[in-house]
Amino acid sequence: MRRILVTGAGGRIGNYLRERLPRPDRALRLLDVGPQAPPAPGEPVEVLRADLTDAGAVAAACAGVDAVVHLAALRGEDTWENILRVNVDGTRTLLEAARIAGVPRVVLASSIHAAGFYRRAGAAPEPSGVPAPAGPDGVPSGSVPRPDSYYGWSKAAAESLGSLYADRFGMTVFALRIGACTTTPAAWNRDAWLSPDDCARLVDVCLTTDATGFRVLWGVSRNRDRWWSLAEGAAIGYDPVDDAEAYTAGMTPMDDAHAPTVGLLGGTFCTLPLGKPR
């Protein structure tokens, strides 16, 4: 029986994975700072409550697990101090605990906002004249970070920590630049949508692939309007099924509030005040 630690398990994505990741040879250890639903009869999960910045509690949570799915973080812009404490120091605490416990594999939840200032191919050129890096299948997942906010910077910092632990200690670390993971897409996030089922497919591939080392992958579905390449995910077996286009009929048109940043991957995050909690 393989045991997988999921941090931030009480959040939206954590709950999606709680429903979809368990299987006969896999059990989940669910860690969150807040309350979670207790295990249902026969559900192969263990529920823990602890703060990610509590090194002792995180070390205990990592003991005896085969892999970690690290979702715990502030989910949007916040003060610099909070961003550092939770998203950066918390990630370092988690990676160090995993290393000491001998956990060989970590899946980190990064974000498209780590690369939010990339432009859509065909959008107005940047003042610097730098073209959009999109290839025939979209922006490559290995594109260097261009964060759009303190939040986006913290996700880029988490990726860098993952790279450090992979190179220095031989761990396998996948950083997933996740788009908008919701049950159904909206007009404003249809290009970045990641369906719950595709999210589980991507995480499952990261947990089971023979690929090693450090990799950055885009966490998006097979959306017709996506900006991002799926080639790197395909190389390790990620084959998303869902497409936001299937929900077009139920969408309302994008409002004018999104127009100034429609050509930027990070959307409105690119213009929100830095350090102001959303």
At which residue positions do the language-model features occur?
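Conserved beta-loop-beta element that borders a ligand/cofactor-binding pocket
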Residues: 110, 149, 159-184
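Alpha-helical substrate-binding/gating segment
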Residues: 167, 177-183, 193-214, 222
